[in-house]
Structures are given as structure tokens and as C-alpha cells.
Amino acid sequence: MKIPGVATVLGGVTNGVAQTVRAGARLPGSAAAAVQTLASPVLELTGPVVQSVVQTTGRAIGVRGSHNESPDGMTPPVRWRSGRRVHFDLDPLLPFPRWHEHAAMVEEPVRRIPGVAEAHVEGSLGRLVVELEPDADSDIAVDEVRDVVSAVAADIFLAGSVSSPNSAPFADPGNPLAILVPLTAAAMDLVAMGATVTGWVARLPAAPQTTRALAALINHQPRMVSLMESRLGRVGTDIALAATTAAANGLTQSLGTPLLDLVQRSLQISEAAAHRRVWRDREPALASPRRPQAPVVPIISSAGAKSQEPRHSWAAAAAGEASHVVVGGSIDAAIDTAKGSRAGPVEQYVNQAANGSLIAAASALVAGGGTEDAAGAILAGVPRAAHMGRQAFAAVLGRGLANTGQLVLDPGALRRLDRVRVVVIDGAALRGDNRAVLHAQGDEPGWDDDRVYEVADALLHGEQAPEPDPDELPATGARLRWAPAQGPSATPAQGLEHADLVVDGQCVGSVDVGWEVDPYAIPLLQTAHRTGARVVLRHVAGTEDLSASVGSTHPPGTPLLKLVRELRADRGPVLLITAVHRDFASTDTLAALAIADVGVALDDPRGATPWTADLITGTDLAAAVRILSALPVARAASESAVHLAQGGTTLAGLLLVTGEQDKTTNPASFRRWLNPVNAAAATALVSGMWSAAKVLRMPDPTPQPLTAWHALDPEIVYSRLAGGSRPLAVEPGIPAWRRILDDLSYEPVMAPLRGPARTLAQLAVATRHELADPLTPILAVGAAASAIVGSNIDALLVAGVMTVNAITGGVQRLRAEAAAAELFAEQDQLVRRVVVPAVATTRRRLEAARHATRTATVSAKSLRVGDVIDLAAPEVVPADARLLVAEDLEVDESFLTGESLPVDKQVDPVAVNDPDRASMLFEGSTIVAGHARAIVVATGVGTAAHRAISAVADVETAAGVQARLRELTSKVLPMTLAGGAAVTALALLRRASLRQAVADGVAIAVAAVPEGLPLVATLSQLAAAQRLTARGALVRSPRTIEALGRVDTICFDKTGTLTENRLRVVCALPSSTAAERDPLPQTTDAPSAEVLRAAARASTQPHNGEGHAHATDEAILAAASALAGSLSSQGDSEWVVLAEVPFESSRGYAAAIGRVGTDGIPMLMLKGAPETILPRCRLADPGVDHEHAESVVRHLAEQGLRVLAVAQRTWDNGTTHDDETDADAVDAVAHDLELIGYVGLADTARSSSRPLIEALLDAERNVVLITGDHPITARAIARQLGLPADARVVTGAELAVLDEEAHAKLAADMQVFARVSPEQKVQIVAALQRCGRVTAMVGDGANDAAAIRMADVGIGVSGRGSSAARGAADIVLTDDDLGVLLDALVEGRSMWAGVRDAVTILVGGNVGEVLFTVIGTAFGAGRAPVGTRQLLLVNLLTDMFPALAVAVTSQFAEPDDAEYPTDDAAERAQREHRRAVLIGPTPSLDAPLLRQIVNRGVVTAAGATAAWAIGRWTPGTERRTATMGLTALVMTQLAQTLLTRRHSPLVIATALGSAGVLVGIIQTPVISHFSGVPRWDRSPGRASSAPRQEPPQSQRWHRSGWQAQSVSCNLMNALTTRKTLTRVDRTYRRPR
């Protein structure tokens, strides 16, 4: 579609630029003609633009005609036209928000017009949408429509039914101003650039920079802009400011500013064109007459008093501030003035910069400067970079979203992403495509809840109902009878419908039907958590399972408008994601979208169009996920733009103060038009574009369906997942340039370079991450400042220090990632995939999947949804899967639930709300008994184990030592800046030149920045990580090692962490044992051995190397075998097994038939649960003996044991062959048993667990045991591990009823928690942190993953099924020895001590340098005693290497095992060493460290000042004095470093080496000249006798960098003779 005037503008601009270039050096008249040609097309657009501005401003300020003025003679303007579709604006004729009330009066006569195919009123837009016939004359039809609408409007007015409150449309999609405004501004920029080039070529005089300063004052003063907007509106203000700025730039011949603005406007034009294209494509569907019109009902206005005149600030999309408004009692949007009013980082800085520039300009005038100085101050404070960075990000992001089909109604919303603090997700947006049964109830015999559920679900999906079980009835002729549906409502809907299941005319049950959750709901919530914003979910029916994934929830029916307002008032700007479905069409949703700072609505083609939204996406959540992922990037882009603006202002101010800005007289100089402010703006522009492109390049999220597979029949599951054709995997689109490079990399010549190139690319990425440090921008600005006032070499030196720090950190990052990848690769799992015929019916394929014998062994990573896997004990489940076959199946799910006992599994569906989900297998669980086949339903990030990592809201990783150093840096930097300012001020007081004074101040401020801090932190953590890795602890996140040094509370998961998750026999008791016997007898006792032998006979023996059928069998047989070996007996070698009955949960016992020898009597041996075995036993006194038996069982259970009863009887049932013995026959005979005794089993504790717990308690650390086991088991295990015997056990149920304060208080006092869920584990860790504890969480399962991530230090124990815990952990223990945890804590303390001493060296030394420089400047000749290079040399010799040596060296000397006579003595020494380290003072960077820094700084300054004073007040040269001070400065710091680590050979060698390097630098001519540290005079006597002579003020040179320092070195050697001095005077005399 063509936009009127655009072609004219482009053609005129092109001709104007060409004529300007041809003008060359012609007369000014020709240049003026060229400018006129360039501007003429812009002037042609003045009329339409002014008209639009007037209309917009009238709407903005509420200007209307008189309420009594008739609309006669007025015709509706055309707002949009594309092809056969035309939009007429009804607002000028019917100025009220309820256009739909008179829709029928408008639509009917328009539809009767010849050539009109369809017409309807789009009430929310205030438009009449007309679709013309293909063969109709569009112009005639449009004129007739205008006449008819005008007549209808007049009739309505005369009928007196018009009320005309102030109103405006929600949005104005397709408004040509969206392109015309930035296009006009771009044309003005081109005019300004043409005028500038013409002025350069024609050598025309330029206007003073006060002209540009005045334009900048208008353009960048928020108060001034607000005043203009109140009079001209947004569009008028935008055009006026663009014209003012372009005129000022053209008159002053400034090229950089219009060039940057042209780039920015080009981005806005491309963004607006993309939005317009999307509107053209989606308008027929969005403005369709078949869509329902949302009802509009009055709501409470937020405008205040009724008499208050409502206003809004609507504008074209190009202005980026459009608000969607209907006032006068309908949907309250723009009069809700809080929308978008909260200032973001850019707005905050703009206000500061506006005030600061005014203050700077006033100061320049007061100090005696002229208007040019004041103008320079104003121009230096222009926050251009802040604006352009955000605009570039939003424009590129908006264009990218439009390219994927997302409709952005308000581009200003993209500019507000950086200030979002709350994300509200409406459950309506999480609706999937298919209906789902949420609750089922059976009402007739043969129709239980599960049967009703599966039949109703099949009917909803158009599938055949599954075959009934023997006790169920067939579903022939089943249908759903829906309850009457309610229409659209003004109250929030819940998305729930009711239906009866009718079979053969009879109602057999009822169901509640909602919708499946969108597959992108989980990625959406996970992305929302990563934004750092508060995540709030408003439920609808079916979203209850997502409660644990958000910060807070609200029940269905909660008013969304009220919720958004409250959250915005309480927490800040709100981003709302919702959808308007047909059954959700309420004004509550539309109003909430209107007032949300950013409103995102999913489009439902069957529902009303959400015109109040800022962005309308497609029908799924994929685009919403991308928008959420842009939040942190937008925030970072704005903050980066603000930092660049600050740096540009600082450098511009420095140029202004030193006068360097005035030295460039050539108007075409690159340095003149790319000043620091423009350079910062250009950098921000590129950075913003790059950030937006990074968001757009993010891969699409992986869908994670939440279908209730456990409640569906296996046949239904198989038909949905594997029954149909499976789509081929499609690779994502790869840019052409990447494909070309990839093809070239496989060429024979280039192939060897692939590996190094990939490594370099990875190193570059890692280095870029390391540069994200608060010191980086400070050092970058300092380097630029050094280049401005000092030397380029000084700037390169500073930049080199930054680069070395970043590369070193990047290398460490790559090493850690490679080690982690190697660990995970070693634990790659293989799985058997069943080969299923591809060509067959679904039912036959299912049968093949269940019974086929052909399998293929593949990597677990290659599994896809729909694959069938074969599993047996003791394999780990590789993915979430629905069971198809389960033979005596028991699964250990402790990694998910924390419950150490195996759970039984089944194939039959379970209730939809059943939390056990017995028909499912979950990734990471372990098969402990039986055999299974299952169909994969989820892999990778879609599994329950991986979701557990992000299942809890507000989980953040702990801050590293860098965060602590940032706090210290924020305290130190003001001191260094103050030192630089003091040096400058003192130099000026001593009558030094302004340039030299500022140069000295900058040198001090830059060189005193402790640039070694990031490197110290990186290397110290690297050293600690390497030492821990060598001991069996892989450090995945080295930055958390610092927290290890401060950990005071260690939380342990029990199952699989402190225990091996493997059962062992603890005791065997004869039936006659006393109930309260304590201690329990040993299994080697004769009576106990008989019980254990009988239990072993009842256990199922392994066959053909397949392993044990059950974990209890394995434990009992292992104990019996060990017992036989210890007793040196034959054991049960004579026991002959005749038949076996394996354990089944439904049966409750295992049995075996056998005899001793060949002639023995066949015996039936049973072992099983006491509640199953005891009723089958024959007791002498049933009442007393049964009570005694229960007492024994209860006593053993209180010890945390799993109890099995063992019984026997003779077998006289005939056949005893295994294949002929039926389990039912055994069950029938298993009565009148003789009770033999009891076997107690328990989870096996790791051998290192108790010593670890005891050592931690001895080191005054708090130990917390968290488990999902029964409280009795938890108490027993705690006692076994060394915790106090009287420790109280707190259950999850007790925690659930407590508020946060009571929760924290209880957690601080308790040591054992039982029956806790994964969410409660996180709550326990969080409660401990609120109490001020520094926590470590040690775990091995997915149920520990969120708590591991929440803790200050997360520690994962490597083992079966522990991938989720490893993925969330900062440190992974790679072997079974938990004792390495003590080494980790010691390393944390050692690292902290090293960092603390290194920080003392770095910061304390810099403090001393600043003090020495200030004193030297005050009492010297007005010059700093040392310069930038000298201070960098000092930092290199005293900070870089000595401080790093201290950082990587432990303060605590570890005992040498060779010094001790025995291993026990060495081990005792090691224990004492660890204890001494751990019970020492807690390391910190607070007051104690500050005292050390001050002490070192004072000592350093005193030593250097003393040496400098001796040199100054004794005969000698000025350079000799400076060298003496510099040498003393270095030696004083090295001496203090030696005292810090006098036991470390590395530190001693580094200190002595640094001293030697200093001597070498001083005595080596070339190096001494470069560094500015001249060597000692070879004739000390002559030097001491020569009087100090200083050249007069007129002879002082003002050169910088290498030249000035080389001159000073030559001068020191030449001052001994008058002849040489005269030559120096002639050579370096200042030119007149």
C-alpha cells in the first residue's frame, strides 16, 4: 500500500542531496537553492501533518465542538484503506465511546449501498469497517458511505440521544503518522546534513554553538518538553523538536548529531513500516464482522473527582507514547495517569542530566566564562546515548516481532519494558487448543470415576472409547450432554463447563470440562522467573498445578483490573499477559490490558479482539515467551546506555575544562563532529541494536505439554503419541553467511582451523561475560580520559590491564564448563528402545510395543516422545514415560519425593488428581524390582525432574566474591576520585596550568582504581577450584567458593546423600525377643542367625545373572552370605529351592518352597509386612502374643527400621515343581504359620556421613537434616548420624500452617525436618537465610534441585538419577566420600583470607598512593610526584603479582603428613587443622578489612612521603626526588606483603622478584625513559652537590606522554653544567 507523500519526500530528498553535492564550491546562492530543493517535499507534507497534529492535540486536550453543534456537513474521514477494505472514523460524528449502541443504525443503511459487501461498527475503535464488492467503484462507494453515515449521525443528534464526553480511540492502527513523523524528521536531518556539507564546501561561517545549546536545552529538558506537549500534543512536539534540532545543526555545521538522528529515524521508519505491514495482513481477521464485540460497562474511574476534566496523551506510534483511552464511563485507560508514569533508568538519568547541565552552565557563567562555555556545558550534558540506546533496542525488537507476525499497537510499550517490575499472567492466556476433563464422577454401577474420565476424554478428542475392564460397562453410543452455557459477562470467567456423560440415554456420570494447558506455559513461567520480576498468576480452571511455579497466585474470578492496579501501586510497572476468549469476553480483561504498563494479549479468532492491548500475538504463547525474555535484556540495554551517556558527558566535560575542544578549528574534522557525546550515542545505538538482535536470535522455547497421561488408557496414550505419523525434525533457519562459513570450514585447508576457531570464539564469548564488571566502564572512561589529557600509551596500558583480567576470567570459565561437560559425558546413559513396526494399525503396533523382543540400545539423549523403552532392575529411567507393561514393578522415586521406600507401579490409569501417579515413570527414578515397558511422554527440559529445578519462584543464585568486591569498590571509588580532585585543586593553587592540573588529577583517579580486584577474585577462586577438583569436588560455579568461607549452616537431604539409598540388614530378632530390648542383638548371635537364615530362604534367588527381584531380597541375601562367611559354616548350601513366589505389593509377602537336602521335609517359608504375616500365624495365646508382636514391630520402627516378619510351615500340598506351583495355591496354604522372628532393614548410611556430621558440629557449624521420610525414621537416622538424640522432628504439615515469621523462627531452632515437599525444602532454606544464616544445601535428587539453587552454596552429590541436582549445583561431589565437603569449607575460608589480604594490598596500596600524591602536590611545585605510568608501574609491581600470589596462597599452613610418625597422627593433625580454620573469625569485607586498608595506606604513604621529603630537602634534582619517592612507595608495600605471607615461598619469590624488576627498570635506560623513572645519577657526589634548579615558569613545557617524560629524563642528566642547561633552554623554550 502506498502512503501519500512518501514517494515525494524520498524523491525530493534524493534530488536535494545530489544538487547539494554538485553545488561543491559554488556561490552561497546555489547552496541555498539546493537546500530549498531538499526541503520542498517536506513542506508539501506540512498541511496533512499539521491537520493530524491539530486533530491529535484536540483529542489530547479534550477540544470538541459545542455539544449543541450539529454534525451536518461533516463526513467521516477514512482512517485506513487497503484493497477492498475501508475504515471510516466515527469519532468526529459520534463523539462518545459507546459507538456500538448505535451500530445497527449505521450498519443497516450502509449495507444497502450498492457495491458494499459487508459493513460493521468496530465499537472499541470507533470505526465503521466496510468491505467493498470486487467489481464496485471504490471511490463512488466511499463517497456514498460518507454521505449515509453523516445523515445517520445527524438523525441521532436530532433525536437527542448523543452525549459527548471527551473520548479517544484505544489505538489508531494504520495511522500514516506512524511513518510520516519519523520520515519528516529524517528529511529534516538530511536537510541539516546537506546544509552542513554545503557550508564546509563553500566555507560559509557557522553559527556559534550556543544555537545548538539552545536547541538541546529545549529538546532534552523534560519540563520544557512537557510544556510543549501540553500545547502542541505529542506529534506536534516531536515535529517541532526535530525541526529545531535540524535547524540548529545545519546552522552550526554539525554533522555528527543529524547523522546519528538519521540512523535512529531510519530504525523508527523500518519499525513503523513493519507494524503497518502486519496490520495490513492481520486487519481482515482482527476487524472481522464475525468476531463478537466486547460489551462495555461502566467501571470506577481513577481520574478522581467527577468534575475533573479527563485528559489523555494519545499520539502516533512514532512518538512511542501512545495510550489506549476511552473515558466517560467505559474502559478506563488514559485517565489512569499511573500508566507508564514510573520512571525507568533512562528517565531518571535524563532528569539528572537536565539539572546537571543547567548547574554546569550556570557555574561556567559565574566562574567568568562566556556564553560559549555555558553552551559547551549544556551540550556536554545531553543524554543522547541514553535515548538512542533504548530507542534502537525497541525499534529493532519491534521490527523483529512484526516480522514474526506480532501486531504492536503501541510501540511505546516496547520502550517501557526496561521498567517492568511485576509480570501478571492470566490463566486465560495459558489455555491450550484442546478441551480437558478436570474432574469426573461416576454415578452408576460399572462406571467409576476413572471410567467416566477416560470415556469423556476420548469423546472430547474425537477418539474411540477404550475397551472396558471386566468390571466395567461398554461405552457404546456414549455422548456428552452439555449444561447451558452462560453468555459473555462483565465479571471474570473461570473457563469451566459442566457436562453429563450419557450412555444409551442414561446419565452414568458427570464431568467438569476445562482446557488443556498450553505447551508453552511452563517455558513462559520459567522465562518469567529469569526476568527478575515478581510473577503473579490469576488462576482459571485447570491451572492449579502451576501454583508452585509463581511468586503468588489468585483464585479464579479475581478481578484482573483491580489486581493490576494494586500490584502497580505496590511494586511498580506491570506487564500483563492475558487473552480474551469467547467465554471470557468481559471488560475486566480489556480494562486491565488498557491500564497495564505493557499489555500483551493472545488472539483468539473466536473471541473479541483485544484492542486495548499494546501487543496482540498469535494464538499460542511462543511470542509471549520471547517478549518476556526481552525484559532483562531491555533493562540491561537501558542501563548500558545510561552508563555510556555518563561516560560521554564525563569525557566531554573533560575536553571542555582542558580546552582541548577548542583546539580543533577544522569544521570537517572527524574529532569535531564525533565528540564524546556523539561517540557514546553511536556506541549505545549499536549496543541497543545488538541487544535486540540477541533477543530475536534466541531459539524458540521447547513445548512442554502437561497432559494427564497417568489418567488415560495406554491405548489412548499410544495412539496420540506414536499412532500417527511423526513429523520430521526440521533444523532452524541458518543465515546464509553462516552456511557459507560452515561450508568453507570443511574445506581441506580450513578443516584444521575449526577447533582453534571454535575455541577462540568460545573464549571471546567468555571474555565478554567477564567484562560485565562494574570496574570495566570506569577503567574504559579512565583510559579515554588519559588519552585526552595524557598519552595514548597510558590509555593502552589501562586497556591492557582490563583485557588481561577479562581473558584470564574467560579461560577459567571455559575450564570449569569443560570439566562439567566431561563429568556429564562420563555419565551418559544408554537405554533399550523397542523396535516397533512402522506399518500397522495402532492397536497392532501397541501389541508389538508390549511384546516385541527386538530392541536397540541407544543414548538416552536421542529418545523422542513416542519411543517405547524397555527397563529392568536396577536401571535408571531416562525420561518421563507412561507404563505399557509392568511386571512386579517397584520403583525408587526418592530423588523426587525424598521417600526412601520403593513405590509400586501399575498399568491401569489412575485418577486425574492422584498425586502418586502410579501409572507413570519419571526421569531419574530407579527400577528396584520387576520389568517395565513404557512410552516416552517427555524428555529433556520437559520432564518433571527438570521442571523441579525451576518449580519454585524467586530462586536466585548466590552472589560471588565479585559482588562483595563491588560493594567495596563503591566505597573506594569516591575516595580515589576525591584524591584526583584534590590533586587538581592543589595543582591549581600552586599556579600550575589547567591542563597539567587536570592531567595529574586524571592520572591519580585512573591509576588509583583497583583494577586488579576482578583478577584477584578470579584467580583466587580458580586456585581454590583447582584444589577442590583434585580432591573430588567439581566446582561448576567458582564464584560461590567465597560463600563457602562464610557458611554456618549446612542442610542435608537424607536419602541418597547421607545414605546410599540401599537397604541393609540391621538386626534379626527371634519371636521371643523382649519388646523393648536395647541394644538390639547382633546378627551373628545364634538365634538371630537362624532368623536371618530363614528370611534368606524365603527370598527370591537371582536367576541367569538378572539381578535381584527386590531390594529387600538383595539386602537379606547379602547379609546371610556375609553371615555364612563370618561363621565359617556351610550356610544354606543344603537348602534346595523347589518353588518361589516373588514379592508383590498386592500380596504383601514373598514365599519359597524348599527342603534341606534331598530327603528333607518340604517347607513353606514366608517373609513380608508384619500386618500381612502376623494374622496368618498360629499363636499360643493370640491376645498376648499378638500384642507382644506388635510391640516388637513398633519398637523396631521407632529405630527407623523397615520391619519384615518371617514365618514357616510344612508344605504338604503335593506338587512342588516351580512351573506348576501357583501363587494362589501358596496363598491358600499360607495359614497356621509358625512365627520365626523379625528382620529390621534400614537405608545404608555412607561411611563418611557420621564423621562428617561430627566434624561439622565440632567446628561449630549448624547441621540440618531434611527428608521426606516418616518422622520416626528421620529421628532414628539423625541419631545414627550423630545428631542429638533428643532432637525434635518438625514435619511438613507443621510448616504448612506457619507464616513467614514463625517459619523463620522455627527453622532457626530445629535440626530435623521430615515429610517435607520440595517446595518446603526451599522454604526452609529461605527461612534460614532470613535469619541471617549463610546456607549450603547438599542433595542428590530432583526434589533437592530448587533448594540447592536457593542456597548460598548448592552442592550436588553425583549418583544415579542425580542429573537435576547436578545441573542446579554450584559444586558437584564426584565420589562417595562426603569428607571432601570439609575440605571445601576450609578452602572457602582460605580463599576468603587470601582475597582479604590481597584486597588489603590492592586498595590499601592505592590509598597510600593517593595520600602520597596529594601530599606531594600540596608541598611540592604544584606537580604530582608520580604520573600515570609511574602509578601503573607501582600497581604492576606491588599489586598485580604480589597480590595475586597472596590471593592464591593459603593463609593457613596445612600439616605435612611426612612430619608425623603414623597415619593416625597425621589424620588427627589434619582434623585439628580443619577445626582451627573453621572456628576462626568469620571472614568479611566490612569494618575489619577497612581498618587494615587504612593502616596499610597510612604506612605506605608515610614511607613514600618520608623518602620523597628527604630527596626534596637534600641537594639533588626533581626527578631524583620523584624516583626516591617511587622506590620507597614500592618497597614499603612489598615489605608489608612479605609480613602478610612470610611462610609462603611463592609470595617471597614474587616480592623479591618485583624489587629486582624495579631496580632493573630504574637502571635500564630505554625502559626507564619509557616508564618515566630515570635511573640514579652515576655520580652521587656530583648530584648531591649540585644545587636544585628549576626552569622559570615561561620555560615549562606542556607536552604530554612520552615526549614530556623523555625530556625530563634528559634534563636530569644535563643539569650538571650551565652549557647544557642553556642548550635545554634554547631547545625547549616555549614558542611565542
From Swiss-Prot:
Active site, UniProt feature: D1053
Membrane topology note: Multi-pass membrane protein
Location(s) in or outside the cell: Cell membrane
EC number: 7.2.2.-
Presence of the UniProt keyword ATP-binding in the record: yes
Chief location of this protein within or outside the cell: membrane
Region (Disordered): 1573-1601
Reaction catalysed by this enzyme: ATP + H2O = ADP + phosphate + H(+)
Keywords carried by this UniProt record: ATP-binding, Cell membrane, Magnesium, Membrane, Metal-binding, Nucleotide-binding, Translocase, Transmembrane, Transmembrane helix
Stored Pfam families: Cation_ATPase_C, E1-E2_ATPase, Hydrolase
Top-level EC class as recorded in UniProt: translocase
Sample GO molecular function, one term: ATP binding
InterPro entries in UniProt: ATPase_P-typ_cation-transptr_C, ATPase_P-typ_cyto_dom_N, ATPase_P-typ_P_site, ATPase_P-typ_TM_dom_sf, ATPase_P-typ_transduc_dom_A_sf, HAD-like_sf, HAD_sf, P_typ_ATPase
Regions that span the bilayer: 148-168, 177-197, 358-378, 637-657, 673-693, 778-798, 968-988, 997-1017, 1401-1421, 1432-1452, 1547-1567
Residues that hold Mg(2+) according to the record: D1340, D1344
A single Gene Ontology CC term: cytosol
NCBIfam families on file: ATPase_P-type
Protein family according to the UniProt entry: Belongs to the cation transport ATPase (P-type) (TC 3.A.3) family.
Name of this chain's protein: Probable cation-transporting ATPase I
